Amino acid sequence: MPINFSDEERLATLRLIRSARVGTNTFWTLLRLYGTAQRALEALPGMARRGGATKYEVCSLAAAETEWKELRRLGGRFLFWKDADFPSYLKGMSDRPPVLATLGNAFALESFTSRVVLAIVGARNASLNGQKFAASLAEELGKRKFLIVSGLARGIDAEAHRGSLKTGTCAILAGGVDIVYPPENTLLYEQIKKEGVLLSEMPLGQAPQSSLFPKRNRVIAGISIGVIVIEAALRSGSLITANFALEYGREIFAVPGSPFDPRCRGTNALLKKGATLVENVEDVVQAFDLFSAPVAQTTTPAENVPLEPVSDDLVKKARMQMLSLLSAAPTKVDALIEAMPYPISAVLTALVELEVAGQISYTTGQCVYLNAQAFSEE
């Protein structure tokens, strides 16, 4: 257990990320403002009221303890961002999940700190050749000591998991770690739970929803040293994963396909933009021999040290200006901070107050937008 990270702070961390309208960006902002999850929890109801909410309750201690005990009953555990075995590459993400629920083989989980992690993603409606290639490539990469990560979707994801079951595989889930989706992959889910590892940042029992898949995709990209895309349409979740990988400085690989197959237009587009072409396992291995692999960060991008406190009046002014500057179109948080003549503590506090009150929301990334019910303060 890391120093200065007690069981009480772990439960507070779980409660904070499970509280209403507290996403990963808001979680890390709260840590910067208050230093610990416990202090942030104490401040949250007041922040919601100042943001315009008439009622706000944080996740209760009983609810967090119930989820904790249920995960242990299932044979799993929570991984917290300060834990030594928290996946190394995730530590460098500004929007990394602070808590991951895990189920599966303890040895496979330990592999995240000792093996090179590669993601393989692709089309759900993949061709037979694409599926066979995914399974074969995953198997060969596993023999070369790579740990294979994917999203347990039908098609390419499922075959990548099947190919790497014997050598080490990890499924990142869009719903709770106890929820099998799609149902047709129930047997594969059970096999991974026995031989590999299942990870999710979502609460137990959370059913997958369309809005949760991009969040899942960012974890797939962030947890890996590189992403291999096999068959992907121009508008697909696989390309979302690739875009996150580019943002995080990961290597991008793509398998070429027929120009007449819509399932290959996304991968061919990645190749045009400079992705490494993959026809066999040697193409992947040689790429890491030629290029320096990104170094996994062992420190967090923004340390959880409290920022300088500012007056309520200054925060109110920042909140009012923020409501006038934002719209339904997403705005980069960095651009918003730069446009406002207030200390960063005031701007960050205003951001949290408005989000937990339901007036603004974050996209999967570093953008915010105004919700329909938002109002301007008088």
Residue ranges of model-derived segments:
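Glycine-biased, small-residue-rich flexible motifs in mid-sequence functional cores and linkers
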Residues: 1-7, 80-378
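Short, small/acidic-rich helices and loops at N termini and domain boundaries
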Residues: 1-85, 357-366, 370-378
